[in-house]
From Swiss-Prot:
Glycans are attached at N558, N744. It is found in: Membrane. Disulfide bonds: none annotated. SMART domains: AAA. ATP binds at G920, A921, S922, G923, A924, G925, K926, T927. Residues 14-24 have a biased composition (Low complexity). PANTHER family: ATP-BINDING CASSETTE TRANSPORTER. This is ATP-dependent permease PDR15. The gene is PDR15. The chain crosses the membrane at residues 532-552, 568-588, 618-638, 643-663, 700-720, 784-804, 1220-1240, 1313-1333, 1341-1361, 1369-1389, 1397-1417, 1493-1513. Residues 1-38, 829-873 are annotated as: Disordered. Induction: Transcriptionally regulated by PDR8.
Length: 1529
């Protein structure tokens, strides 16, 4: 991870001619044995400054323009003029041919020195203080305390209790907050940090470190700071900082959130642009300045080689995790904040790289007079020595604040003992841990009382001289905070601001520049992910061809028979254009965390980002619109007129932007994606139904007509229809009456059958059709355009406002979650407090253990295990005598052009009862070795031999080991005990009884000390187990499997605080003491942690062994080995791990004096290892037994038992996931209520029948929302299975997949039943069935179809996600297939009018059979009752009754009826007499109902079978995979 930093530092080291300096930064950095950013001697720095100020072109440019330039930061002056003889930036920095060039200032030079660069910039600024206005910022806080809302110990939400739980929370919100409902996160504390100082904050998770950093960085969102607290920044208040100077005080959270598709350079360059000051170096323009600062930041933090590499994330491949962390650090460094708060910024970095980061901060502080506060969990001694001050916290109490060099003595004087080789930081943190701190023997012998609780230690602090001195410093600093100090900061900030930037704004560049730079960034993103836009255009073009060609045949007639289909095609067009932007909500939530972070850095307004995103999305939207609409318009054969087409295109573009801005508003108004999808889905349904096609405006029920009036698409659809039909005369396609008996009739004796026809006319005017059918008038054509534009503008500004002012979800403190039944039991037993104090905000760390816990001492190996003998009695952990050993292990992976060796002839063994550490530099192959030994690599070639008691590994091996991954992966809804039992049930042999497995689980809980939270739910960060508890559970899950051979642990202490790391090592030590064999990778542990291990296997770069052997007491055996091979002496107080890394050249700035792999292979120790391996291979096979047939099985449990247990667990998870289930049911209820009451009790008129048909069509649109909710749930299950449970052989893929099928079905049956009960009766289908005398059969079959449809949604979702990695991709594919199935189901275009080519799509669409059956079940076998406007009116021949006149026609047509057959003046004729005739026009028939049901069930079965096959094909490892093992003879 830090190799690139090391390369830079090595070059700097070689170029450095002096190692001492009177400069404070140089003095601090020069104290360490291996140095990173080497300092220059004071004389060299001053000489460099003189050279730059006398010879540089900057100075010349300044001199030449002195007459015309002035120092007002906001005048048009020469500093913005870009000199034509500069290459990007002044040649002093970048052009080697320029006189005075210094390579130490050139970030592209191998000799670049960040210290020299910072010093040079400081010299430039101080050379002209009136222009550059240098300033600094410190912070003092007095009586600072913070509080948050108290949280009950929560109970697990379930499907049954979530509603009363939410109601209870709602009632609490209505009540005024009481004092007992809050708790103090921070007790009153004080501090003073002056410019140029570094402060380290130490404390365990939950002690208040994060809250302190947020409080002093004016970032108190989520908690409250007491009114009497004083926080002052040179006289500025927290409110001043938030409103006007937010960018001067920055809080950096530990998470690394970036736009994954941007390169490292683009990410940092955007930040540099936003922070380029107006009063920058004279003669350098903005772009050159930003570019140079970006290159300096990349060179400083070892990122230059990643310049054009994507930053990436968990899903997008990019830079490594450590490099991503450095990008985050560089981002803050470019911001140039004068006061910086770093919250666990070194997490994910090894100690060497973390040290380089602290040194960079020290350089900035010493030279640039910045102030920085760093909360750090594991801090080496070298890093600690760089800090000026330290603050120690415990349980919200301040235990110490003062000089870092005095802290150790302070606590020793208090009565605590610091063991040898323990770092000062670890010692200070251990004071807060009852199980780790050691009371000095001298105090014990004298009987002196030593403060032990946080409150006692805080009181001791308040009585100390150090506290009195601190108060004096604070008071003195507050007195200096005058108006003059505030004016200096105000003037400096104003000088940095660009023209037209409001003086009160915290931003450096103005709003227009922000939008400009963000536009460029967005276009970079689009270029990096151009394939997404390309596929969107291609996909929409294909859909245009498909949908357009569907109407191609019927539209060619251009007569009245096309009326319905023209409306349907127009409806399709506007919906497709409008809803093409629905999935923009996903991208909003992808970028929101970045925007919120940049807002706190004061880079840009969130609304500027929103503005830029809208502008940058215009080109792809317009391209997509052009491709779709040109193809669709001309394929459908809409009106061929240039003006008409462009109006059509204009309206559809407006529809696109209207709905785009509306969905963006929804996304900005909500705080999570889940919150946004529900209202978005509801809006989609409402807008679709009330556009005016599914149910015309004149037919909308009175209670819901307001929805039409506020629906923007209603007006746009009206304009489109007017545009298509106005001033057109459509020839009549069918007359009434017609036939052989009516050849000679003329005039008013016949009429066209289309709506809007007049007797005697052989055509229908388009305007008449629109007026009669939709109540549309031509004068409203441009009204729709105007209203649409108004909506676009309105939603756009609402979107900007919401983005600017909508804050993210507040962070919550941590709480433990139990099952509700268990909470009642615990409260009854008195084991649970009524109130539980949440832990540290933001980091979601666990609250501190009870400070009254019995004091324990650190024990050496001979007395390991702090449990009493009674505690250890009866422990039944699996013990094994088998020895695991390997020899000449090599691992090669294919790369471009050949093979790359990762492991090179590694030997070793792990014996029962021993704890072996696997160490090495970053990239040495530690985790790879662990994976090879555990059979977890998925590609490459393994050579060498891996034995168990002298026998090569066999099929029983994977079941005989436990593997604890670095990530703590668990099912969040299970309790601790349930997780352990699940592992025991499925991984222990089936011959072991359930009772015995349960007893063994209890033993595991006991030895891991998890009794207090054994019934707690695993949960998620902040609401469940904390970091340490999760790590214990990870180990427990593997122990519950009763591995008879050994346990592998990968980086069990990575990312943990020192106390939790110590507890984890103590736990491993305890397991080894009880006979467990353990092999553990660990990254540069502290000296105290190193003493817990028995043996060490150390690898260097290239996977080569440097040492394998005993560590000895105090690591003496290992130290003696290296010293005997020529290494320099290990200082008595040094960390042996860091000393060893330095010796072998694995630490930054260090160089090995010899090849220690060669030294090892030529050593006596190596020969002893080989002899031991020879003995093992010769003698161990005879004492071991051959694995039984049972042990050779891939899984301990049968497939049936696996399926049973996994299904039970999954049912349990669904029950405990109310968000997913209630979202499904709420969407179902809303959709069906909305549809049902929109078409409430539809009558049997022609319009009523069409409404009932379209209601069935709309009934299916719930497919997409339900599908999109299901996919993430499956992905979570699959990730857990594939990452942990499949490699550990817990259960097979078939049991996993079948359980996914089975468990989803009952909930879909329930959802389908709910939908049926609401929809079927609300629309009025039951009335039709009752009138036909078929109430029970039709109702039952309709119900079966309803539940089958919801099961079909689940089957399609499973099919889509079975082979897709990402839920979004599966959702896109599912939506596309559903759209095609719905388009060809026969509703919008009947099979009679479809081109012959598409008939096969009609037949393969599963919705064809469902909608055919539902329509028949809903309306078949009853009479039609036309409304008055649907009756065709004409006059019969004189002297003839209507009945006689129409008899021949009715007989020929087979349908139709007269309202009054005896009438002789006006005949009122309805063209359809029965609903069966209506069904026939859509090729629907009642007799096919059961056949259609059977076919639809076959589709569901096919989906499940295909999904199972595709999952096996794409995701199940095959035995003939990419991994090959070649044992050596």
């Amino acid at each position: 991870m830090s190799s690139d930093i090391r390369d830079v530092e090595e070059r700097n080291s070689r170029s450095s001619s002096s190692s001492s300096s009177s400069n404070s930064a140089a003095q601090s950095i020069g104290q360490h044995p291996y140095r990173g950013f080497d300092s220059e001697a004071a004389e060299r720095v001053h000489e460099l400054a003189r050279t730059l100020t006398s010879q540089s072109l900057l100075y010349t440019a300044n001199s030449n323009n002195s007459s015309s330039s002035n120092h007002n930061a906001h005048n048009a002056d020469s500093r913005s003029v870009f000199s034509t003889d500069m290459e990007g930036v002044n040649p002093v920095f970048t052009n080697p041919d320029t006189p005075g060039y210094n390579p130490k200032l050139d970030p592209n030079s191998d000799q670049f020195s960040s210290t020299a660069w910072v010093q040079n910039m400081a010299n430039i600024c101080t050379s002209d203080p009136d222009f550059y206005k240098p300033y600094s910022l410190g912070c003092v806080w007095k009586n600072l305390s913070a509080s948050g809302d108290s949280a009950d110990v929560s109970y697990q939400s379930t499907f049954a209790n979530i509603v009363p739980k939410l109601l209870t929370k709602g009632l609490r919100l209505l009540k005024p907050s009481k004092e007992e409902d809050t708790f103090q996160i921070l007790k009153p504390m004080d501090g003073c940090l002056n410019p140029g100082e570094l402060l380290v904050v130490l404390g365990r998770p939950g002690s208040g470190c994060t809250t302190l950093l947020k409080s002093i960085s004016s970032n108190s969102h989520g908690f409250k700071i007491a009114k009497d607290s004083i926080v002052s920044y040179n006289g500025l208040s927290s409110s001043d900082i938030r409103k006007h100077y937010r960018g001067e005080v920055v809080y950096n959270a530990e998470s690394d959130i970036h736009l994954p598709h941007l390169t490292v350079y683009q990410t940092l360059f955007t930040v540099a642009r936003m922070k380029t000051p107006q009063n920058r170096i004279k003669g350098v323009d903005r772009e050159a300045y930003a570019n140079h600062v970006t290159e300096v930041a990349m060179a400083t933090y070892g990122l230059s080689h990643t310049r054009d590499t994507k930053v990436g994330n968990d899903l997008v491949r990019g830079v490594s995790g450590g490099e991503r962390k450095r990008v985050s650090i560089a981002e803050v460094a470019i911001c140039g904040a004068r006061f910086q708060c770093w919250d666990n910024a070194t997490r994910g970095l090894d100690s060497a790289t973390a040290l380089e980061f602290i040194r960079a901060l020290k350089t900035q502080a010493d030279i640039g007079k910045t102030a920085a506060t760093v909360a750090i969990y594991q801090c080496s001694q070298d890093a600690y020595d760089l800090f000026d001050k330290v603050c120690v916290l415990d349980d919200g109490y301040q235990l110490y604040f003062g000089p870092a060099k005095d802290a150790k003595k302070y606590f020793q004087d208090m009565g605590y003992y610091c063991p040898p080789r323990q770092t000062t930081a670890d010692f200070l943190t251990s004071i807060t841990s009852p199980t780790e701190r050691i009371i000095s023997k001298e105090f014990i012998e004298k009987g002196t009382r030593v403060p032990q609780t946080p409150k006692d230690m805080a009181e001791y602090w308040l009585q100390s001289e150090s506290y009195k001195n601190l108060i004096k410093d604070i008071d003195s600093t507050l007195e200096k905070n005058t108006d003059e100090a505030r004016n200096i900061i105000r003037d400096a900030h104003h000088a940095k601001q660009a023209k037209r930037a409001p003086p009160s704004s915290p931003y450096v560049v103005n709003y227009g520049m922000q939008v400009k730079y963000l536009l460029i960034r967005n276009f970079w993103r689009m270029k990096q992910s151009a394939s997404v836009t390309l596929w969107q255009v291609i996909g929409n073009s294909v859909m245009a061809f498909i949908l357009g060609s569907m109407f191609y045949k019927v539209m060619k007639k251009n007569d009245t028979s096309t009326f319905y289909f023209r409306g349907a095609a127009m409806f399709f067009a506007i919906l497709f254009n409008a809803f093409s932007c629905l999935l923009e909500i996903f991208s909003l939530y992808e970028t929101r965390p970045i925007t919120e972070k940049h807002r706190t850095y004061s880079l840009y307004h969130p609304s500027a980002d929103a503005f830029a995103s809208v502008l940058s999305e215009m080109p792809p939207k317009l391209i997509t619109a052009v491709c779709f609409n040109i193809i669709f318009y001309f394929l459908v054969d809409f009106r061929r007129n240039g003006g008409v087409f462009f109006f059509y295109f204009l309206i559809n573009v407006i529809a696109t932007f209207t709905l785009s801005h509306l969905f963006r508003c929804v996304g900005s108004l909500t705080k999570t994606l889940q919150e946004a999808m529900v209202p978005a889905s509801m809006l989609l349904l409402a807008i679709s139904m009330y556009t005016g096609f599914a149910i015309p405006k004149t037919k909308i029920l009175g209670w819901s007509i307001w929805i039409w009036y506020i629906n923007p698409l209603a007006y746009l659809f009206e304009s489109l229809m007017i545009n298509e039909f106005h001033d057109r005369r459509f020839p009549c396609a069918q007359y009434i009456p017609a036939g052989p008996a009516y050849q000679n009739i003329t005039g008013t004796q016949r009429v066209c059958s289309a709506v809007g026809a007049y007797p005697g006319n052989d055509y229908v005017l388009g305007d008449d059709f629109l007026k009669e059918s939709y109540d549309y008038e031509h004068k409203h054509k441009w009204r729709g355009f105007g209203i649409g534009m108004a909506y676009v503008v309105f939603f756009f500004f609402v979107y900007l406002i919401l983005c600017e002012y909508n804050e993210g979800a507040k962070q919550k403190g941590e709480m433990v979650v139990f099952l509700r039944s268990k909470i009642k039991q615990l409260k009854k037993e008195g084991k649970l407090q009524e109130k539980h104090r949440p832990g540290d905000i933001e980091n979601n760390a666990g609250s501190s253990p009870d400070s009254a816990t019995t004091e324990k001492k650190i024990l050496d190996d001979s007395s390991e295990g702090s449990d009493s003998s009674s505690d250890n009695a009866g422990l039944g952990l699996s013990k094994s005598e088998a020895i695991f050993h390997w020899r000449d292990l090599c691992y090669d992976v294919p790369i471009k052009g050949g093979q790359r060796r990762i492991l090179n002839n590694v030997d070793g063994w792990v014996k029962p009862g021993t704890l072996t550490a696997l160490m090495g530099a970053s990239g040495a192959g530690k985790t790879t070795l662990l994976d090879c030994l555990a059979e977890r690599v998925t590609m490459g070639v393994i050579t060498g031999n891996i034995f168990v008691d002298g026998r090569l590994r066999d099929e029983s091996f994977p079941r005989s080991i436990g593997y604890c991954q670095q990530q703590d992966l668990h099912l969040k809804t299970a309790t601790v005990r349930e997780s352990l039992r699940f592992s025991a049930y499925l991984r222990q042999p089936s011959s072991v009884s359930i009772e015995e497995k349960n007893r063994y689980v209890e033993e595991v809980i006991k030895i891991l000390e998890m009794q207090q939270y054994s019934d707690a739910v695993v949960g998620v960060a902040g609401e469940g187990l904390n970091v340490e508890q999760r790590k214990r559970l990870t180990i427990g899950v593997e122990l519950a499997a009763r591995p008879k051979l050994l346990v592998f642990l990968d980086e069990p202490t990575s990312g943990l605080d020192s106390q939790t790391a110590w507890d984890t090592c103590q736990l491993m030590r305890k397991l080894a003491t009880h006979g467990q064999a353990i092999l553990c990778t660990i990254h540069q542990p502290s000296a105290i942690l190193m003493q817990q291990f028995d043996r060490l296997l150390f690898l260097q770069k290239g996977g080569q062994t440097v040492y394998f052997g005993d560590l000895g007491e105090g690591c003496k055996t290992m130290i003696d080995y290296f010293e005997s091979k020529g290494a320099h002496k290990c200082p008595p107080d040094a960390n042996p791990a860091e000393w060893m890394l330095e010796v072998v050249g694995a630490a930054p700035g260090s160089h090995a004096t010899q090849d220690y792999n060669e030294v090892w292979r030529n050593s006596d120790e190596y020969k002893a290892v080989q002899e031991e391996l020879d003995w093992m291979e010769k003698n161990l096979p005879g004492r071991s037994k051959e694995p039984t047939a049972e042990e050779h099985k891939p899984f301990a449990a049968s497939l049936y038992y696996q399926f049973k247990m996994v299904t039970i667990r999954l049912f349990q998870q669904y029950w405990r996931s109310p968000d997913y289930l209630w979202s499904k049911f709420i969407l179902t209820i809303f959709n069906q209520v909305f549809i049902g009451f929109t078409f409430f009790k539809a009558d049997r008129s022609l319009q009523g029948l069409q409404n009932q048909m379209l209601s069935i069509f709309m009934y299916t649109v719930i497919f997409n929302p339900i599908l999109q909710q299901y996919l993430p749930s499956f992905v979570q299950q699959r990730d857990l299975y594939e990452a942990r449970e499949r490699p550990s052989r817990t259960f097979s893929w078939l049991a996993f997949f079948l359980s996914q099928i089975i468990v989803e079905i009952p909930w879909n049956i329930l959802a389908g039943t709910i939908a049926y009960c609401i929809y079927y009766y609300a629309v009025g289908f039951y009335a039709n069935a009752s009138a036909a005398g078929q109430l029970h059969e039709r109702g039952a079959l309709f119900w079966l179809f309803s539940i089958a449809f919801y099961v079909y949604i689940g089957s399609m979702g499973l099919l889509m996600i079975s082979f897709n990695e990402v839920a979004e991709t599966a959702a896109h594919m599912g939506t596309l297939l559903f759209t095609m199935a719905l388009s060809f189901c026969g509703v919008m275009a009947t099979p009679k009018v479809m081109p012959r080519f598409w008939i096969f799509m009609y037949r393969v669409s599963p919705l064809t059979y469902m909608i055919d059956a539902l329509l028949a079940l809903g309306v078949a076998n009853v009479d039609v009752k036309c409304s008055n406007y649907e009756m065709v009116k004409f006059t019969p021949p004189s002297g003839t009754t209507c009945g006689d006149y129409m008899a021949s026609y009715i007989k020929l047509a087979g349908t139709g009826y007269l309202s009054d057959p005896s009438a002789t003046d006006i005949c009122s004729f309805c063209a359809v007499s029965t609903t069966n005739a209506f069904l026939a026009t859509f090729s629907s028939h009642y007799y096919r109902r059961w056949r259609n049901y059977g076919i639809f069930i076959c589709y569901i079965a096919f989906d499940y079978i295909a999904a199972t096959f595709l999952y096996w094909l794409s995701r199940v490892p095959k035995k003939n995979g990419k991994i090959s093992e070649k044992p050596k003879k």
